[in-house]
């Protein structure tokens, strides 16, 4: 007879994990899920195993709003190795070409400027994007290259940090869907020497504060502390979570009377005085401004529910 699956906790919020190098985003997610004994968990945009930094992990009902973080801006610090190109565009791949580094600072400045603003980017074959239902990296590992369409991205800021010998360090603030490995590879080709990523750290996702990031080591230490003090781990771990509505905190708020919120919870659009004319809104209920979900402004001006928090249904 199979053993019944142990039920986890109904815990809701967002943990800003500082992902360590060498760990996949999914492995990091599973570790956090176990530490919190959470029923549900999901991350908001994978980091390569080589990369470190901010990986927001949504727990419970917060998973419904993870897409809004996938769509948000990101900020990275990257160090590129000049003179070498790899098949994956990072240090985890095989070197496929070596060339001398012979450009000038003026040439570097001009090359960097071409990557600022609205640009087109062809995703790497070593990415999780799909072609005919199969991930690109699965083709790449079989030595197969498939067509990829250039995608529109925005590089809001590309800051030169340092250039020492064969190392180039940059800070990049970019839109969703930007591959830093691809920017590095394309820059290396433009400079005529090739380049690949040897260090990558995600500094920020959306407007989340970097000082709220926590490591797996810190989480395990708190778990051990809870055991020593004979208290529930939740007492030490749960205060680290950002609110479940933090992925949508920048959307305009529409506050509803409880009786009106009742219609929204049943999936019905409602007319709200003073609501924005269009776009997404964050819906709250009553004087306590309890978060109940997000909605769209319909063509007729009503607030139509889009994603709702089930646990608040009566």
Curated annotation (Swiss-Prot):
GO biological process, one term: mRNA pseudouridine synthesis
Keywords: Isomerase, tRNA processing
GO MF entry, a single one: tRNA pseudouridine(55) synthase activity
Binding, substrate: 43, 76, 179, 200
Documented EC number(s): 5.4.99.25
Protein origin, superkingdom: Bacteria
PANTHER family membership: PSEUDOURIDYLATE SYNTHASE TRUB1, TRNA-PSEUDOURIDINE SYNTHASE
Role, per record: Responsible for synthesis of pseudouridine from uracil-55 in the psi GC loop of transfer RNAs.
Family: Belongs to the pseudouridine synthase TruB family. Type 1 subfamily.
HAMAP family: TruB_bact
Full protein name: tRNA pseudouridine synthase B
Origin species: Serratia proteamaculans (strain 568)
């Amino acid at each position: 007879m199979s053993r019944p699956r142990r039920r986890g906790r109904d815990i809701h919020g967002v943990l800003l994990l500082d992902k360590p190098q060498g760990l996949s985003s999914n492995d990091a997610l599973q570790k956090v899920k176990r530490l919190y004994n959470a029923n549900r968990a999901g991350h908001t945009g994978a980091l390569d195993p080589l990369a470190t930094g901010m990986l927001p992990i949504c727990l419970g009902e917060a998973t419904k709003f993870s897409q809004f973080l996938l769509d948000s801006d990101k900020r990275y610090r990257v160090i590129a190795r000049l003179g070498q190109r790899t098949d994956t565009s990072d240090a985890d791949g095989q070197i496929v070409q070596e060339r001398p580094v012979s450009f000038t600072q003026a040439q570097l400045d001009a090359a960097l400027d071409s990557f600022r603003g609205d640009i087109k980017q062809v995703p790497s074959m070593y990415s999780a994007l799909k072609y005919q239902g199969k991930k690109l990296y699965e083709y790449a590992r079989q030595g197969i290259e498939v067509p990829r369409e250039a995608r529109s991205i925005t590089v809001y800021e590309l800051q030169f940090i340092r250039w020492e010998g064969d190392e180039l360090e940059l800070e990049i603030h970019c839109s969703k869907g930007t591959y830093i490995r691809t920017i590095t590879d394309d820059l290396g080709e433009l400079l005529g020497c090739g380049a690949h990523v040897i260090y990558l750290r995600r500094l920020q996702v959306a407007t989340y504060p970097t000082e709220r990031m926590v490591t797996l080591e810190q989480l395990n230490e708190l778990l051990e502390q809870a055991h020593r003090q004979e208290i529930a781990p939740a007492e030490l771990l749960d205060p680290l979570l950002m609110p479940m509505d933090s992925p949508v905190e920048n959307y305009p708020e529409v506050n509803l009377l409880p009786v009106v919120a009742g219609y929204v919870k049943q999936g019905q659009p409602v007319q709200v005085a003073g609501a924005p004319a269009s776009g997404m809104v964050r819906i709250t209920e009553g004087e306590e401004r309890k978060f109940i979900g997000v909605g769209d402004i319909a063509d007729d001006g009503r607030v139509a529910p889009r994603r709702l928090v089930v646990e608040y249904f009566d």
